Amino acid sequence: MAAATLTSKLYSLLFRRTSTFALTIIVGVMFFERAFDQGADAIYDHINEGKLWKHIKHKYENK
């Protein structure tokens, strides 16, 4: 019974009106994009460890 109540509250809060539905999608997309970009950057950095400028610049900087 609690799941039905939670579902109905979620529906009435976020998905019932078109404006809140659109806002929910836009906010969700923004969070997904941020998480996807950070994940892709982390994978890229891991695959190219030691080859990127940020990993080797300490060898070439003047002290």
Swiss-Prot record:
Q: How does it assemble?
A: Component of the ubiquinol-cytochrome c oxidoreductase (cytochrome b-c1 complex, complex III, CIII), a multisubunit enzyme composed of 11 subunits. The complex is composed of 3 respiratory subunits cytochrome b, cytochrome c1 and Rieske protein UQCRFS1, 2 core protein subunits UQCRC1/QCR1 and UQCRC2/QCR2, and 6 low-molecular weight protein subunits UQCRH/QCR6, UQCRB/QCR7, UQCRQ/QCR8, UQCR10/QCR9, UQCR11/QCR10 and subunit 9, the cleavage product of Rieske protein UQCRFS1.
Chain's gene name: UQCR10
What is this protein called in UniProt?
A: Cytochrome b-c1 complex subunit 9
Recall the taxonomic lineage recorded for the source organism: Eukaryota, Metazoa, Chordata, Craniata, Vertebrata
User: What SUPFAM superfamilies does UniProt report for this protein, alphabetically?
Assistant: Subunit X (non-heme 7 kDa protein) of cytochrome bc1 complex (Ubiquinol-cytochrome c reductase)
The segments annotated as topological domain Mitochondrial matrix are 2-21
Protein purpose: Component of the ubiquinol-cytochrome c oxidoreductase, a multisubunit transmembrane complex that is part of the mitochondrial electron transport chain which drives oxidative phosphorylation.
The membrane topology noted for this protein in its Swiss-Prot or TrEMBL record is: Single-pass membrane protein
Q: Does the keyword Membrane apply?
A: yes
The family note in this entry says: Belongs to the UQCR10/QCR9 family.
Organism encoding this protein: Homo sapiens (Human)
| GO CC aspect terms | mitochondrial inner membrane; mitochondrion; respiratory chain complex III
Which keywords, in A-to-Z order, does the entry hold? Electron transport, Membrane, Mitochondrion, Mitochondrion inner membrane, Respiratory chain, Transmembrane, Transmembrane helix, Transport
Q: Where in the cell is it found?
A: Mitochondrion inner membrane
* Mitochondrial intermembrane membrane side: 48-63
What are the recorded Gene Ontology BP terms?
cellular respiration; mitochondrial electron transport, ubiquinol to cytochrome c
Bilayer-spanning residue ranges = 22-47
